[in-house]
Each structure stands twice: as C-alpha cells, then as structure tokens.
A protein has these predicted regions:
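Short helix-loop-beta junction
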Residues: 265-279, 330-332, 410, 452-456
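Short beta-strand segments
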Residues: 2, 243-245, 317-320, 371-375, ...
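Divalent-metal (Mg2+/Mn2+/Ca2+)-assisted nucleotide/phosphate chemistry catalytic cores
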Residues: 298-371, 375
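Iron-sulfur cluster-binding cysteine motifs and their immediate structural context
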Residues: 95-102, 157, 162, 167-201, ...
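Short connector loops at secondary-structure junctions
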Residues: 249, 274-300, 324, 341, ...
C-alpha cells in the first residue's frame, strides 16, 4: 500500500471488486463502524478511522449490494458475537440493537412504513450516544442511501434483488429486443416490439424463469442471493443448513466438465462443506415425505369417490411446482380445493429442519438458516410466501439456483472435479428412488403411484417403473390397470398445456384421477435456474436419464420404505395425514390478482 494511498488503491491491491463491478460503498470497523462512499474513493485513506474499533477491516460493497440487507447482516453479526460473550460493553444497548434488527428485517420483507426510518434513527442515535461512538453504520446507511430505504418501503422493491420477499424479474437496458423472452413465456406476460426493450408484467409473472434461460444477452435481472449464503456462514451463532434438490445433482456438473446427467451429489456436499455450510441434507428425503402425505390424501379421495361421495374433488393435482401453483391461483380461483394440500418438498424440508431437527439440537428457528439449492427461480417466490413462515421467520430463509451456486464455487476457485466425495448428513439426507425422480417430468406422479397402489392393495408391486407415465409430450395421459385398480393419470409440463387441460376438466370434457403439472419443459431438470444449454432437449433427456439411473441403483425405491421417513412418523408425526402432519406439512391456496 503506497503512502497516502487511497481506498481505490487498497481495493486494487486486494484484487479489485469481484466481477469488476462498480463500487458502491466500503464499510470500515467492527463492531460499529461507518460507510465510505464514492466521494471518498480516491482520497487518501484515513487510518485513524480504525483506531477505536475492535477489528481493523474494510468490507467493500458493489453496485449489486443491498444496503438494507448488508445493514441487517452487520447487526446479526454483532448480536451473534454478543451471544458468544463478545463485545460485552454493548450489552448496555442490547435492547436497542435487537429492535434495530427487527426494523431492518421488516424493511427487507416489505412490511415497514416510513415511520420505521424515524424509529431507526432514534434507536441508533441512542446506541451511538450511550457508547460515545463517532460512527454508526445504520445511521450512515440511512443518510447516504436514503433513496434505497424509500424504494424498499414505498415501492416494495429491492433494486439489488437481494431481499427475497421483494424480488421481481426486470428486463434491463441490456435488452436487444430479440423477442426470445416473449416467445417462450407461457403466460404472455412479456411485451415489447422487435429491437426495442421489453417489459415484464410482474402481476402476471409466475417466476418460472424460462425467459431468463432464453435470453441470449443476460438482460433479465433475476436477483442474486449468493451473498446471503456467504454472510450467513460468517455470522456467529448461526447454523447454516443446505438442502439440495434432486435435479441439481445431474446438472451442476456441466459447468465443471462433467457430462449432463452425471450424478455429482457427493462432490456437491464436499464443496458446500468447504465454503462453510454446517449441514448438507437432501430435498429428496422431503420428497419421500411428500409422497407419504400425497399418496395418503389421494387414497382417501379415491376411496370416497368409489363409495359414491359426489363431494370428493378429483383429479388430485400435484402441488410441488410454485410457478404452476401461482398460475393456478391466478387463473382457476374456483378450483382451489382440487390440488393436493401437501407442501412442496422444499418447504416440507425447511419446516422439519426448523421445527423438529433443530429443536432436537437445542437450536431456535432464528439460529438456523435454511438455504435451498434449487433448479428453479420460482422457488425464490415460494420461499417468500407468508404461509411458509412463523411470524417473520420464514421456513426457507433463501434460495440459491444451480447457476448461483456455480458462481459461488467458481469465485471460490472450487472445482468439483478435484474434490473427494462426501456423504449427505443424516437423518435428513437419506432418500429413496421415488424421491429422486421428483426432478423429472412424470416423476412425482410415478413416485406417488408406487406408494398409493401398494397402500390400497396391501401387496408389493413386482414392477414399480411405470413407463406409461414417462415421455416428452407437453401433455400426455395413461390408463393404469394394476390388479383391481384402474387409474387415469395425466401429466403436463408447460403452463400452456396445463391451462388447456384444466379448461377441459372445468368444462367436464375430460376426467382424470390424478394429474402432475410442472411449469418447465422436462420438469425441474429444465428449471429456470439450471445451467443454460445449446442443445436443450438433448441435455434435458440426459438429465432425466441420470435421475432414472440413480433410482434404479438404489436399494430402496419406494418412499414408504425409507427408514428415516418411518422414524419421523413414529417419533413426531404419528402417521400420514395425522393432525400433527397436517399442521406441519400441509398448506392452503389463495386467489391471486392477475
């Protein structure tokens, strides 16, 4: 560092801002430092700023950072240190610090009003005066980035896309007007003329992300929660739990020289542990739990139907895909009692992790941070739904897509090819073949059929591979006859096809006992958060084959035979569809404005 060197010199000496992004601010000093902004960038750095601080450090924020999200992390870090008996002098203002965090949390979730900024000023002024501080980061963040607080509160928008409850897709000025996005949008919520910037109607958008996959220039802003993970890992007294969806393991390897469809789950576990995640579990385990609830619900509806109960709702519709659920809520508000009430595997996992697993370890919900590694951008929207929370503590804290995780690994110089295999943690990492095939089209209904039929007949099936349910048509149907049971099953992947099929059901033109619906081509393997591929159909088929291969190789291929699933019922939930199971694992649907 040269004598009289500037902040810009220091940043350059450290290797610059990742991705050569534009400088926004630099935070100095812990536990309560302040901000240096752009006007200080090329001035000589005043090292006296650090003399009265416990840590002499600088954290540089880029233009893609959210000030509210960072301020919230800063307070969480301080509170974590205090819980570890550090910074004891701050115990005098612990009440004010905790209230500051709660106000910032409200702002980040779109639940605040402008009076909350006034309250923040009062709280932080009390902290500053009581401790005789020169700087207070939250006060300085309000003064220097007031417009950002205002945008969060008054417009319900996080311009950096880091506050998950406020996430919206946006088409940026990179747009070349090629129309690729509008052509793939299944609900026609993207508009614009050729060679002119397009726009997205977020009131109609289902967040499926197919526009993001199609855009050739990366013009669609989808949010970025990579820093959320890294900051949670850095926060003292925070236990970071990752869950990995089935489709991720057969796609993420494509970015590291593996073939599409190659299962790299054990490398993925190793990489997540390497960056500091405390526990790595498998969403496929929760998919098995989903099957148990959904199959029992399906069995109940079938039995009532065959007894002549004309109030029973058929077909039962799968409820794993959040883009499909939002589409359904917007367009079929008169049919909200038709889908299964079972939560998605992601939300079931997060609920169990916080309310059962964490409790057994003596952890509160607030001490656990659940990050879901998903192939799907709509999962970010799902995680933000109020029904998947307890008060202001959401079951899934945030979602990273496959592409976001690739970004973290690349920036951390982690190459999956060079890692030793590591196993998932127990007990929420043990899954059956039924759970793994949730990641491809037809997989959810096939997994449920394996269990439903055996529940009804009481007999073990000789063949559990229902090839009639597999295929690549946008909508397909199959008539299954197994013993005395006859089932008419439908499968749709793509919201346009789903809409056509539901219109026929609503009009009484078609009848099915059960239908699986996924928003994306191929199901989750083709999700909007997956690696982009030039030969899309070829890659999708390889990913699907990869999941089928895992299923075939597993010793347990039926969800109801998973011993860790049996254990959770025996110890905590009693039995599928019990009152306890219904309280934790089921949800409701609501009409949405279009």
């Amino acid at each position: 560092m040269p004598e009289n060197g500037s902040l810009a010199d220091l940043i350059e000496l450290a290797g610059g801002i990742v991705g050569k992004k534009k400088f926004k601010a630099a935070q100095f000093g812990l536990p309560f430092g302040g901000f240096l902004t752009e006007e200080s960038l090329n001035k000589p750095l005043d090292f006296s700023l650090f003399n009265k601080n416990t840590h002499r450090n600088i954290i540089v924020l880029s233009e893609e950072d959210c000030i509210i999200s960072f301020s919230k992390f800063y307070i969480e870090f301080l509170l974590g240190k205090m819980q570890q008996r550090g910074y004891l002098e701050y115990s005098r203002v612990q009440y004010e610090i905790e209230r500051t965090w709660r106000v910032l949390d409200r702002i980040s979730k779109g639940k605040a009003n402008m009076r909350d900024i006034f309250l923040l000023r009062q709280l932080c002024s009390t902290i500053k005066d009581t401790l005789h501080q020169t700087h207070n980061l939250v006060l300085e963040s309000i003064d220097k980035f007031y417009h950002e607080f205002e945008e969060h509160i008054e417009e319900g928008n996080c311009p950096a896309g880091q506050c998950i409850q406020l996430l919206k897709f946006k088409i940026t000025d990179k747009c070349i007007g090629c129309t690729a996005c509008s052509r793939v949008c299944p609900i026609h919520c993207i508009s614009g003329e050729l060679k002119k910037k397009h726009t997205i109607d977020n009131t109609k958008c289902t967040h499926c992300g197919q526009c993001v996959i199609a855009c050739p220039v990366g013009a669609i802003f989808e949010g970025d929660h990579t820093l959320q993970l890294l900051r949670n890992i850095a926060t003292p007294n925070k236990t970071v739990v990752a869950q990995i969806a089935p489709a991720v393991r057969v796609a993420i390897g494509e970015a590291f020289g593996f073939e599409a469809g190659e299962n790299v789950e054990k490398k993925l576990v190793a990489a997540l542990k390497m960056i500091g995640v405390d526990y790595v579990f498998d969403t496929s385990w929760a998919a098995d739990l989903t099957v148990m609830e959904e199959a029992t619900e399906f069995q109940s509806r079938l039995e009532r139907f065959y007894k002549g109960d004309d109030t029973v709702k058929l077909p039962i519709l799968t409820s794993c895909c959040p883009a499909w659920i939002k589409f359904f809520e917007q367009n079929y508000p008169d049919m909200l009692d038709v889908p299964s009430s079972v939560k998605s595997p992601m939300e079931i996992f997060s609920t169990v992790a916080k309310d059962i697993w964490g409790k057994n370890l003596g952890l509160t919900r607030e001490q656990i941070s659940v990050v879901a590694i998903m192939p799907c951008l709509a999962k970010k929207y799902e995680a933000s739904r109020q029904e998947f929370s307890r008060g202001d503590n959401y079951d899934t804290d945030f979602v990273l897509t496959t592409r976001e995780l690739i970004k973290i690994f690349k920036e951390s110089n982690i190459d999956l090819k060079n890692l030793e295999d590591e196993e998932f943690d127990s007990p929420l990492g043990e899954y059956s073949g039924a759970g793994i095939i949730f990641g491809r089209t037809g997989g959810v209904i096939e997994a449920a059929t394996r269990t439903t039929v055996e529940m009804i007949t009481g007999e073990k099936l000789d063949n559990i591979e229902f090839h009639e349910l597999r295929g690549w048509e946008g909508f397909r149907s199959a008539d299954l006859k197994i013993g005395h049971i006859e089932l008419r099953i439908g499968i749709a992947h793509g919201l346009e096809e789903a809409g056509k099929m539901l219109d026929k059901i609503r009009a009484g033109e078609e009848f099915y006992h059960a239908i699986e619906i996924m928003a994306c081509k191929g199901g989750c393997i083709g999700g909007g958060g997956q690696p982009k591929a030039l030969k899309k159909m070829e890659v999708l088929k390889k990913r699907a084959e990869g999941l089928n291969a895992i299923d075939q190789e597993l010793p347990i291929r039926r969800a109801h035979e998973n011993p860790s699933v049996k254990e959770i019922y025996d110890k905590y939930l009693d039995y599928p569809m019990s009152r306890k199971a219904h309280e934790l694992l089921h949800t409701k649907y609501f009409p949405k404005l279009k």
